[in-house]
Amino acid sequence: MTIEHDFFGILGSDDEGEVYWSEQVELGSESVDIDLNSPDEASVSVEALDIAAAMIRSIEDLDSQAKESLVADLSAENSQTLQYIRQAVEELDDEALANALIWDSGDRQIDFLRSLRLQRVGFRPHHTASDEHFAVLDYSISPDDTDTLLVVALDVNGDPVTISVES
């Protein structure tokens, strides 16, 4: 069985009902990898695909929403965002860090967050509950110098569910 969608085209595969789609989109001067996958085609609704397509079409807004959640996380007691910043400052040499920070407003933490580069957005169209990871955004301060990512998971409404650091 396959699903046909105006934005994604024909989805589905012969692999036991799995759904997979990938593409690259431009965000400013950067390319961002986008993928959509579900282990079960039957659990993917057209509405969820429409929401994912709308998020991809407005990738700048999605990026802004995720970065706003990172700013809000700075004040959290166990802030994953602060952990990522500290880890990057320790891991990267001064030159790599200076090259990665493209903003200089005087607020080092905000400049760091504004300088994050969106690497990938993964959509899980079978996760449509308000506490599930519908869109997962992977950020890096310097993709050539570190494999560590700051990951923001958003629900189907675009609200943050979790923020984590992944290596």
Model region roles, listed by residue range:
Residues 61-144:
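Amphipathic protein-protein interaction modules
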